[in-house]
């Protein structure tokens, strides 16, 4: 049985100034986006369209805004609408926590739509470029969750069960690690390999939606449901229900007829 190390929430301290682990993880996620994105734009499709490193920087800036705004609004709407309707100013208190991946994804989709319109290109050309870069960024986010000892798993007696002392003394699934490995590293490698060859437009995006939806859906069985929501219909969590439309849309994009590469 393992015990969570209870890391200092600050990665670096300079007197009273501290850089928290979340900040470090965000920076690493942004850096990998630019580094791997530089490799992605070397593909013939993007070379033909004249993509440059400046385009990646603009796309990252728009994506960050989408993640923050969408993630926060998604959390307020999907998870705690009653509380935030009664306390609307609390929506601005991002430092208190409360971000939704699915809301962040919707925010990123809006950012991609804006960027595609700005570049006079197809939305799926842009989303196919970005899709293989997202899982590795998510992996850093899940590592941040683990370091901070949050989003822990359900009780279990498996050999690798972990006690999170900040919660209780019950051995639990280290669900953050499951998600890091599944929707992060594994999905990232699959998408990177799949996208290394020319694919019909929308297929890479479809594989991301399907792959993330399945990985997250399965991981939720090991993750402790939100205390204020619990399990919903059919014994599924909110996260699992939000994955259902992702899986359906992913299957549709992978199966639709398209020969344009």
Curated annotation (Swiss-Prot):
GO cellular component terms, semicolon-separated: plasma membrane
EC number of the protein: 2.5.1.145
Positions bound to a 1,2-diacyl-sn-glycero-3-phospho-(1'-sn-glycerol): 142
The protein's enzyme class: transferase
Residues annotated as transmembrane: 17-37, 59-79, 94-114, 121-141, 174-194, 228-248
InterPro entries referenced in this protein's UniProt entry, alphabetically: Lgt
Pathway participation: Protein modification; lipoprotein biosynthesis (diacylglyceryl transfer)
Pfam families assigned: LGT
Key words of the record: Cell inner membrane, Cell membrane, Membrane, Transferase, Transmembrane, Transmembrane helix
Subcellular localization, as worded in the UniProt entry: Cell inner membrane
Domain of life: Bacteria
Family label: Belongs to the Lgt family.
Protein name: Phosphatidylglycerol--prolipoprotein diacylglyceryl transferase
Name of encoding gene: lgt
């Amino acid at each position: 049985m393992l015990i969570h190390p209870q890391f200092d929430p600050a990665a670096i301290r300079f007197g009273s100034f501290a850089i928290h682990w979340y900040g470090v993880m965000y920076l690493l996620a942004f850096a990998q986006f630019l580094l791997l994105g530089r490799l992605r734009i070397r593909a013939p499709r993007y070379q033909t369209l004249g993509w440059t490193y400046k385009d990646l920087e603009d796309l990252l800036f728009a994506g960050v805004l989408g993640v923050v705004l969408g993630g926060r609004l998604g959390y307020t709407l999907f998870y705690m609408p009653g509380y935030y309707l009664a306390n609307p100013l609390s929506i601005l208190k991002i430092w208190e926590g409360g971000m939704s991946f699915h809301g962040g994804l919707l925010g990123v989709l809006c950012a991609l739509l804006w960027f595609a319109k700005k570049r006079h290109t197809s939305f799926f050309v842009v989303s196919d470029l970005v899709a293989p870069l997202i899982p590795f960024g998510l992996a850093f986010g899940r590592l941040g969750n683990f370091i901070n000892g949050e989003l822990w798993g359900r009780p279990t007696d498996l050999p690798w069960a972990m006690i999170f002392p900040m919660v209780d003394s019950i051995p639990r699934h280290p669900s953050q690690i499951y998600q890091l490995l599944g929707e992060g590293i594994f999905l990232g490698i699959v998408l990177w390999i799949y996208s290394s060859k020319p694919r019909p437009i929308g297929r890479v995006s479809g594989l991301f939606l399907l792959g993330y939806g399945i990985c997250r859906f399965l991981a939720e069985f090991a993750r402790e449901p939100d205390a204020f929501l619990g399990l919903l219909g059919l014994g599924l969590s909110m996260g699992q229900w939000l994955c259902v439309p992702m899986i359906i849309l992913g299957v549709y994009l992978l199966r639709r007829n398209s020969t344009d590469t």
